[in-house]
Amino acid sequence: MDQTQGHTPAGRLAGKVAVVIGAGQSPGEGMGNGRAAAIRFAREGAHVLAVDRQIESAEETAAMIIQEGGSAAAFSADVTREHELALAMQMAKKRWGSLDVLHNNVGVSLAGGDGDLMDITEDQFDNICRINLRGTVFACKHAVAIMREQGGGVIVNVSSAAALGKYPYVTYKATKAGVIAFTEQLALQNAPYGIRANCILPGLISTPMAVEARIQAWNQTREQVSAERNAKVPLGRQGTAWDVANAALFLASDEANFITGISLAVDGGRLLNRI
């Protein structure tokens, strides 16, 4: 349950400018990770540019923030198009004067046609790579250019616990592992510029994209999908988008100002199954 409602002008991100890529969400019940992060950042005082391929969904997120008294705007960008990502970063700086936080929260697996090694097609593989990995790289490229010039900033990339744990679908696992490797390189190469970069590794999170895709792919009810996923988590339940958003907020805030290059699992202990 979200217990942090209300805009906080003197909050942990007070006066900061945050771009959230993937701030809309897929159709279905519940809250998506990107929308939750955008709302959470705004509640802690950030100006938020909600970026999504579906402008209506981004506008919905921005409207939710503004209704609570926060500061937000919506922007349409497809992460497979570099120039649109560049425009998003430029818009944030032009509107609010800086770019302090970039949160990349885009990824597809089953919804993008992923499969096991013997089933995946070249087109499916390339499409998922463009969304999951290339989009993150080029969003960071254009954010870093601004952050270097202004003397610092924070990047929080969303990878996945699937990058390190068991996962049956080849492209999602490979691309999310790539996000970890890229973020480590990003952190090391940009530390001299005052830029921090970290990853979040969500586990089984009850978001519209994750649950709805499996309802359709497995021909199961919502209750069946949820029960199966809950049983795989040592803490006995799926996480929520707010769990991921709270981790993103911590890494984006000055509380984490000596943390860079890490991968923070938000998975209810699921990666412990590797031990």
Task: Identify the residue ranges that each predicted region occupies.
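Canonical Rossmann dinucleotide-binding motif of NAD(H)/NADP(H)-dependent dehydrogenases/reductases
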Residues: 10-49
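Residue(s) in the substrate-gating loop at a strand-loop-helix junction
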Residues: 160
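Short C-terminal tail/terminal secondary-structure segment
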Residues: 2-8, 114, 231, 237, ...
